[in-house]
Amino acid sequence: MTINRPSAMNSLPSASHWEAEALLSWYDNEPSLRVLIITGAGKKAFCAGQDLIEQAEFRTGTKEVDMAARRHPPSGFAGISRRMGKGKPIIAAVNGFALGGGFEICLNW
């Protein structure tokens, strides 16, 4: 699984948390898969956490948002931070900065 936003230091916009949750749920239920590796595109950052530019747009009203979609899924940041005990390993291949929620991903796997 590659976080592919190198121009934004692989920060995650709100919708991506739910997309990652869906992908990881599929991974958990796919018997042929034994391990998942998560990494960031580019060489500068693994993940800079939440997309703060998007957050500022929400606060100033320049971007509309569904408040329910803005919340993290029950499994936490990027669908990972509260996903303990699922049984299948997730490896964080950290290639650069891991800031905020990006560091949270690393701590949990």
Residue positions per predicted region:
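Short glycine/serine-rich donor-binding loops of glycosyltransferases
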Residues: 102-103
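An acidic, glycine-rich surface segment that forms the CoA-thioester-binding/catalytic face
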Residues: 17-21, 25, 52-95
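Short, active-site-adjacent cap segments at secondary-structure transitions
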Residues: 43-47, 99
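Acidic-histidine catalytic/liganding microenvironments
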Residues: 30, 49, 87
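Conserved CoA-thioester-binding segment of acyl-CoA-metabolizing enzymes
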Residues: 1-44, 56-58
